[in-house]
Amino acid sequence: MINEIKKDAQARMQKSLESLSHAFGQIRTGKAHPSILGSVMVPYYGSDTPISSVANITVKDSRTLQVVAFERNMLGAVDKAIQSAGLNLNPTNLGELLLISMPALTEETRKGFTKQARSAAEDARVAVRNIRRDALGDLKKLVKDKEISEDEERRATADIDKLTKDAEAQITKATEEKEKDLMAV
């Protein structure tokens, strides 16, 4: 019973960390990275499809992405989708592929992206704390129903607190790394 609560809390905290990592992947740094285009949806046979399903995205050099559509006739649609995605990116259509040069980040955009990163980190921290609260509530319910003793509850609470502390440390570390990437010129 206690192990199930701990495993559930750990799995949910891990999902929060993965969600944070995904959110950080969407925040553009000065370097080219395929995950920047992760949110781009391309109209494909009547439905919006993720760009990764209709094109291959590779890093040509540190500031350039190369996009090759799986179907040549889709290149125009991919081009329009990238331009209209609100990422401030302008692809260059070379007929068979698109080249996307990453514009240098201004100090203002760097600060904006840093705020965005901090906000995502705070959301992850709140999620981890909520998971902790849920797990502790489940433990209290077990004590109330006399399924576990108060000593077992204290030990389990200490374990859950350790999981929470570890998750928050990982969030802090990831946030510091992202901020360092963003502020590097």
UniProtKB/Swiss-Prot annotation:
Annotated keywords: Cytoplasm, Protein biosynthesis
Subcellular locations according to the entry: Cytoplasm
Coiled-coil regions listed: none
InterPro entries: Ribosome_recyc_fac (IPR002661), Ribosome_recyc_fac_dom (IPR023584), RRF_sf (IPR036191)
Single GO MF descriptor: ribosomal large subunit binding
GO biological process, one term: cytoplasmic translational termination
Gene Ontology, cellular component aspect: cytosol
Main location: cytoplasm
CDD domains: RRF
HAMAP family: RRF (MF_00040)
Family: Belongs to the RRF family.
UniProt function note: Responsible for the release of ribosomes from messenger RNA at the termination of protein biosynthesis. May increase the efficiency of translation by recycling ribosomes from one round of translation to another.
UniProt-recorded name of the protein: Ribosome-recycling factor
Lineage, uppermost ranks: Bacteria, Pseudomonadati, Pseudomonadota, Gammaproteobacteria, Pseudomonadales
Protein encoded by which gene: frr
